Amino acid sequence: MAATRTAREVVELYNLVVWNQCNLALAEELFADNVIRHEVGEARTLTREQAVNRVREIWELFDKLRFDLNVVIADDDGEHVAIVYDSTMTTKDGTETKIASIEVFRVVDGSIIEVWNCGYQQGVWN
C-alpha cells in the first residue's frame, strides 16, 4: 500500500501541479469528497466534482496560469499548511495579471478538506 502524502506534499502538488499544469486527474486525487472553502463572511461546501470543475473553469479563462509559493508552513498537527503565493495569469489575448494572497489548507488522510482564503489583491508580495 502506498504511503499517504503529507499535508505539505498535498498542498504543494495542488498548487504546483494541479494549478500550474492544469492536472485535473491529480486534482481528483487530492480533494476529499467534500471541500469547505472559507472566505471572509461565508463558507461554501463543494463536492469533489465541483472543486475539480472550479480549477477547469478558471483555466478556461487563461492561456497560462502559474502559482509561485513564496512561503509554505506546515503545522506540527500534520493537517494544516499555510502558503503565501504570487500568481501570474495570462489571458488568451496576452494580457498578464499578477495577484497575491495567503491561504491555509486542512488536509486529512492525504485529502484537502478545508481551505481558508482572505481574498487576493493585484500585485505581488514585496
Whereabouts are the PLM-identified features?
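Short beta-strand segments enriched in hydrophobic/aromatic residues
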Residues: 31, 87-89, 103, 119
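Residue-level signal for well-ordered, solvent-exposed loop/turn and beta-edge residues enriched
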Residues: 36, 95, 111-113
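Short, surface-exposed coil-to-beta transition loops
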Residues: 66-68, 84, 97-103, 115
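Short, cysteine-centered beta-strand-loop-beta hairpins and adjacent loop/turn segments enriched
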Residues: 61, 88-96
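A solvent-exposed, acidic/Ser-Thr-rich amphipathic alpha-helical stretch
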Residues: 24-79
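Short beta-strand edge/turn micro-motifs at domain boundaries
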Residues: 101-126
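Short acidic-aromatic low-complexity motifs
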Residues: 2-34
